[in-house]
Each structure stands twice: as structure tokens, then as C-alpha cells.
Amino acid sequence: MTVNTTHTLTRPERPAVIAGTKPRPGCAAGDAVLAYLRIQAHTLNTLESAVRADRFDSVHQMRVATRRLRAAFRTFGQIVLPADSEHLTAELHWLGRELGQARDAEVLAAHLRESLQPTPPELLIGPVQARVQGYFAPRRAAARAALLEALDSPRYTRLLAELDRVTAGPARGPLAGAPARDVLPAAVRHAFQQAKRRMRRARHTPAGPARDAALHQVRKSARRARYAAEAASLAEPGKQARRFARQMKKVQSVLGDQHDAVLARQAARDLGIGAHLAGENAFTYGLLQEREHQYAERRQADARHVWRRAARPRHRRWMNTAAG
């Protein structure tokens, strides 16, 4: 999907200038994980004003920071502290859901507009662009209003305070004092194994909505493995962890395309029904629905090849350095 990049967003500070985000070589697991959490918490705080101002891509970036934090707390709960991790995972899930409603409306509208671009004028029957705009504009407005309400809520204020408390350290989980080079690769390996199991399950799921749902679970697991590897890259072996994270990002990306097409297909169907009930010709929406179906099928096939490359043993050898 091509996204307008004519606007720019002030980026958060680079990790090197945020206090406590450069763990020493040979550091404990707690130090490495807290460093990663501080980077993401800083990003979350930095982006809030941009989200409130409706700056381009700010919701997406804040959502990514929220997901990274949530993935880290889920993956490294035995390092931070299980009780803190469980509570913050739930609260970050709430924030991510609010951000997601606003972001998904943006992405889906842009996806459908782009999908319509190559359609010959003679096949654009009726007020198609206006109907697409009318379908998504109120949804985006409602989602944005709900997001701003969430950012103004005491719940969000408490979440930021809890993040400040936990990231201030020290990490108090049972594995916090163990060497990062032993503990973190094992945690990434566990996240990867979950993605592997889900991919195997998706392959054996009959085509249709059930497989679409299964592939969406694979995508979430690949994203979690990617973010876990990013956190592990702050300790040894950093280069190998970053390489693995890039492979998981490829899996996440192709499955994201597939999922977007599934949602776009559903939206095209809803648009067609609305057009029909309004007495309009629904031909173009049927064309759009089939186009999205074909695209989803292609990206699903692509995902199998991308997964095979990403899951090669050479991308995972560094995980076997972990003790246990």
C-alpha cells in the first residue's frame, strides 16, 4: 500500500540519548529488557502530542510503540515481574485497541482508494468514491473521538505512571539477574516456536474465514517474535538478533497485506449492499470484492515462501546459545 509521505513527523530521540538505554556488554537480562522498555515508553510519551494534533502517521507509530511494550511484557514477564507484566499487558492491550480503531479506519480507506485507482472509468459505475468516503469518514471521526477520550482518561494517566515506575527499575523478576546472553535468546526462541506452531495449524486449516483467522494469529506471533528479537539485540548477540527480527518483519508484512485485503473485501461487500439498497448499481463493488479476494490469495501464497525463508536454521542459530 502506498502511503502519502509529504507530511513529516518529528521523530523521538534516538535511543543513544535516552538515559538507561545502553546496557553494558555482559549485562543482566533485567538491564537489557528495561533498556528496551525505556525506549518504547519514551516513544509512547513523545508521540502523544502528535496524535492529539492528528499529525500524519502518529497514530500508527504510537500503536507500534504500544505493541512493542505489550510484547515485551508478555515475553519477558519472568524478567520484569510477573504481576507487573500481566497488569501492564492488559492496560496496553486496552490502549492498543483504542489506537487500532483509529488506525484501521485510515488504512482500510486508503487501501480501497488505491485498489480503485486502476479501474477503467467505464467500470466505475455510480458515486463510488463518494460512497467510500462516506463509509469511512464517520467511522474515522468516531474512532478518533474515542481515542482522544481515552488519552484524556485517568486510566491512561495511571498507565503512564505505571510504566514510569516499572521502567525506573530495577527489574524484580526471578530471571532478572541472569546473564542476558543466556535468557533473552531463549525467550525469543519460545516466541518463534509459537509462530511456527500457528503457521503449521494455518496450513492445515480449510480455506475461508477460518484460515484467514489462523493466518492473523500467525501474524501476531511473528510480530511478537520480531519485537522480542529487537529487545534481545540490545545485548549479545545483537547482529544476529536484528537479522532474525528483519525476517519476522517480512512475515508480518506479507500477512498484514493479506489481512488488509480480507478486511477490504468485507468492506467492499458492505459498500455494495449499501449501494444496492440506495438504488445504485453495485457492479463496481463486486469487482472490488473479487479484486481483494485475488490479492488476499496471492499474499497468502507469498506468505508460505516468506515463512520458509524466515524460518531457516541459519537465522536461528544464535538462539541456541541460551542456557537451558
Where are the regions a protein language model picked out?
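Cationic, histidine-enriched alpha-helical/coil surfaces that engage anionic ligands
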Residues: M1-G324
